[in-house]
Amino acid sequence: MSIIKEFREFAMRGNVVDLAVGVIIGAAFGKIVSSLVADIIMPPLGLLIGGIDFKQFAVTLREAQGDIPAVVMHYGVFIQNVFDFLIVAFAIFMAIKLINKLNRKKEEPAAATPAPTKEEVLLTEIRDLLKEQNNRS
């Protein structure tokens, strides 16, 4: 079997294709969440706490010297990324919770006990007759 044929069979398995679709959708969803945090959530939050832009929070570790740029730790961007993560994690949690709820509804209720077979009915009748005979004696 050629390597190309093996690779094609591997790539076309349902799991690999599903994973690829999930990664692509996840990347697009990440951009939406980043925009939500950066453009919708953080500006009002910054305004509420005094007109602060979180992206500008930074600590300069070393000033710029000539052609050498400054060494800056941008912890505001980190705070924003933490918000991104929390929103993505919450959205995934809610999606999984919804999927689990839908799957539980799809589960059929326990099947009713099957009707007794002819043999079971006959044996039950024999048992009942024997009980009656023992009670008469």
Curated annotation (Swiss-Prot):
Q: What is its main location?
A: membrane
- Keyword set includes Transmembrane helix: yes
Q: Name one Pfam family in it.
A: MscL
Acyltransferase found in the keyword field: no
Which keywords has UniProt assigned to this entry? Cell inner membrane, Cell membrane, Ion channel, Ion transport, Membrane, Transmembrane, Transmembrane helix, Transport
Q: Which residues cross the membrane?
A: 10-30, 76-96
Which compartments does it reside in?
Cell inner membrane
Q: Which domain of life is it from?
A: Bacteria
* Bilayer topology annotation: Multi-pass membrane protein
What's in the GO CC field?
A: plasma membrane
Q: Which GO terms describe its molecular function?
A: mechanosensitive monoatomic ion channel activity
| Protein purpose | Channel that opens in response to stretch forces in the membrane lipid bilayer. May participate in the regulation of osmotic pressure changes within the cell.
Q: Which family, according to the similarity comment?
A: Belongs to the MscL family.
Q: Which NCBIfam families match?
A: mscL, PRK00567.1-1, PRK00567.1-4
Please describe the quaternary structure of this protein.
Homopentamer.
Q: What is this protein called?
A: Large-conductance mechanosensitive channel
* Record organism: Escherichia coli O1:K1 / APEC
